[in-house]
Amino acid sequence: MKIGLCAFSGYKIYPGHGKTMVKIDGKSFTFLDKKCERSYLMKRNPRKVTWTVLYRRKHRKGIEEEASKKRTRRTQKFQRAIVGASLAEILAKRNMKPEVRKAQRDQAIKVAKEQKRAVKAAKKAAAPAPAKKSAPKQKAAKVTQKAAPRVGGKR
């Protein structure tokens, strides 16, 4: 059993179906049905007609790709220096005993507090003692005029 292909749509044509058109120059075209034949004669581009095989191939429709295993990238540990501290310093601090680190930390805190106190004391000495507040001035009383007598009748 010979199965042909439609010249326009690309679908299979089984025996007993389809129509063959032969042009004057000898080229023969086999169409699945009248719809394909008319579309060809109207010079439609099968790549732009959504139901044709060529369109589906061009726009990658219905292609089931092999689901290859996705590789997950493992995070790699990497040690490097940080701004203000070299790698050697960081490693030295890490390898110190906790008691020594605690003592060092307490010492640093103590020094920082001392500096803070010194700055505060210097600021206090530099700023002159605030002058005594004088009694607030009393505002002058507003002079209000008497309302003019109403002239006129009852209404």
Curated annotation (Swiss-Prot):
Gene3D superfamilies: 6.10.250.1270, Ribosomal protein L24e. It comes from the Eukaryota. Transmembrane segments: none annotated. Residues 124-133 have a biased composition (Low complexity). It holds the Pfam family Ribosomal_L24e. One of its GO terms (biological process) is cytoplasmic translation. Keywords: Ribonucleoprotein, Ribosomal protein. GO terms for molecular function: mRNA binding; structural constituent of ribosome. One of its GO terms (cellular component) is cytosolic ribosome. Residues 119-155 are annotated as: Disordered. Belongs to the eukaryotic ribosomal protein eL24 family. This is Large ribosomal subunit protein eL24. The lineage of its organism: Eukaryota, Metazoa, Ecdysozoa, Arthropoda, Hexapoda.
